[in-house]
């Protein structure tokens, strides 16, 4: 049972990473050069979330 729950959580994390990846690409392609500060903040936040999700997967 524990393995099933772990696999479900990992699948959900993988799905979240897929959504974040699509969001990252979308923002990278749509933000204009004058919105550089917004992009830098988004980049930093999204990369932080990716790192946290990776850490959770390693702990599980």
From Swiss-Prot:
Top-level lineage group: Bacteria
How is this protein named in the record? Answer: SPbeta prophage-derived uncharacterized protein YorY
Q: Which organism is it from?
A: Bacillus subtilis (strain 168)
Q: Which gene encodes it?
A: yorY
